[in-house]
């Protein structure tokens, strides 16, 4: 990192320094207070599904949260719909570390406005920002280099060090209960409860086989 980059980081406020009161329906965009209206069913339902999916696909080293405020600049304090960030606190400040992944659901707001938020998050250092476009049933990733959204292959997966197992893109864009995708992720992570259930099932099958012999 160059000395100019270090100076720029030092001049930024901590990500946990608030411009707005937490747990209120407001964000700060370019120094102006912006009211964020409560979600309607399509947005709220997809956000709930997304939270379940992200929780299932992250490992113990990361946490996920909904509507988590992040101070991206001196004049911006904004909250992605879902954030994925390190579970360990920042060793320098003791506060939360910057998220590695951010997800924004596009329903009532425009993709252009979601792009403005993505640019602010990426400018602060968030590694990857995604958008779930409900109306067009597609997922996109923000390209800081191009300053635009890039559509993702619906048959593909999101692979990232913040994820314990790859996240299927189809599960993000289809309006369906995420149970199957969550179950597959937990099996891939060798969830202890599921592993115990599987072992007990195998033991019962072997016992039944011996009894029938």
Model-derived features: positions:
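Phosphoinositide-driven peripheral membrane association surfaces
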Residues: 213
């Amino acid at each position: 990192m160059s000395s100019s980059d270090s100076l720029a980081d030092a001049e930024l406020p901590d990500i946990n320094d608030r411009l707005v009161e937490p747990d209120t329906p407001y964000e700060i965009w370019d120094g102006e207070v912006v009211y964020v209206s409560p979600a309607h069913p399509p947005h709220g339902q997809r956000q709930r599904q997304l939270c379940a999916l992200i929780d299932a696909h992250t490992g113990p080293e990361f946490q996920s949260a909904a509507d988590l405020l992040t101070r991206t600049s001196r004049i911006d304090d904004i909250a992605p719909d879902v954030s994925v960030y390190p579970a360990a606190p920042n060793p320098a400040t003791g506060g939360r570390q910057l998220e590695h992944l951010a997800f924004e659901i596009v329903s009532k707001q425009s993709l252009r406005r979601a792009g403005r938020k993505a640019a602010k998050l990426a400018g602060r250092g968030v590694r990857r920002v995604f958008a779930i476009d409900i109306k067009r049933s597609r997922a996109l990733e923000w390209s800081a280099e191009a300053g635009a959204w890039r559509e993702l292959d619906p048959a593909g997966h999101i692979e990232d060090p913040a994820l314990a197992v790859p996240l299927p893109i189809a599960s993000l864009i289809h309006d369906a209960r995420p149970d199957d995708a969550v179950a597959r992720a937990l099996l891939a992570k060798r969830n202890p409860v599921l592993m115990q259930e599987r072992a007990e099932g195998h033991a019962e099958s072997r016992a039944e086989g011996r009894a029938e012999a």
